[in-house]
Amino acid sequence: MKLATLRLSEGRTVAVRVDGETGVETGHTDVGALLRAGGLEAAAAADGARHDLAGADLAPVVPAPGKIVCVGLNYRNHILEMGRELPEYPTLFTKFPEALIGPRDEIQIPPESDKIDWEGELAVVVGTTVRRASAAEAEAAIAGYAVLNDVTMRDWQYRSPQWFQGKAWENSTPIGPVLATADEIPGDAQMVTRLDGEELQRTPIDDLVFNAVDLVRYISTIFTLNPGDVIATGTPGGVGHARKPARYISAGQTLTTTIDGIGELVNVAVAERVDAVAAAGEAARA
């Protein structure tokens, strides 16, 4: 089964089950709300209003996760290209919901950074509440998977040993296009990242040092994971910063991220209009 969150013309969002080119409303405002209501199984039989998905405006599949936990250095080839040893434990950092954008939304390029890199990733979406999960509990807690690109401001990331400040910029991180349950994803699924059509990353998603179950177990030891929480599992080799010479994303370029069985993100990078943001802030304070 595949689920998506649609933006409708009247400003509201709805969760839909994807039936071919049609989205069937499940009775929830978004996929996160569906999961929090325990509606994953019921979504398979939902028979609500129908929407044509051709050209539909897709929101982040989970628009406002309670937690977004990201994993660094989790693909063997990426660890080696960055000159590091395989880790004993996962490296964790976080994002806020304000970082997330939809699968066709524009990536905002801030004027404060000129070293903006791509990091295609598999995202895990949690479906049930777990704490200190066993392997079986961790597997059962996974509602499904999405595509994510952890677009990174490298010049900010390396200002300190903590990566967070390069990873959490607003309107930088596409996620979607759907939540796909595990049965939708082939065992040999590949993650591919392209910039303006040029292939830059291609890796089997099972090349993870710590797989999805490992991560749910480890993270749930630290704190409770709840329905709708997102875990970004890390990026494979092929990032721009590790290339000789280094390469980065510029305004006007199109970043495409694909995982077999889940779908594709297509996001154009645009220069952030700081004047517009400032004006909005002034209006809110008036």
Description of each model-found segment:
Residues M1-P90, T256, R273-V277, E282-A286:
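N-terminal non-catalytic cap/leader segment that marks the start of a structured domain
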Residues A4, L58-P60, E81-G83, I107-I116, ...:
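A generic local secondary-structure boundary/capping motif
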Residues E21, E85-Y89, S134-A146:
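Short Gly/aromatic-enriched secondary-structure transition segments
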Residues R7, K95, P111, G120-L122, ...:
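Short, structured patches in soluble enzyme cores that scaffold and shape functional sites
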Residues H51, H78, R154-A286:
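Catalytic-pocket segment enriched in acidic/His residues
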Residues L86-P103, W118, S250-D260:
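Structural signature of FAD isoalloxazine-binding scaffolds in flavoprotein oxidoreductases
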Residues P63, D117-E119, N226, S250-A251:
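Residue-level recognition of short, solvent-exposed, well-ordered loop/turn junctions
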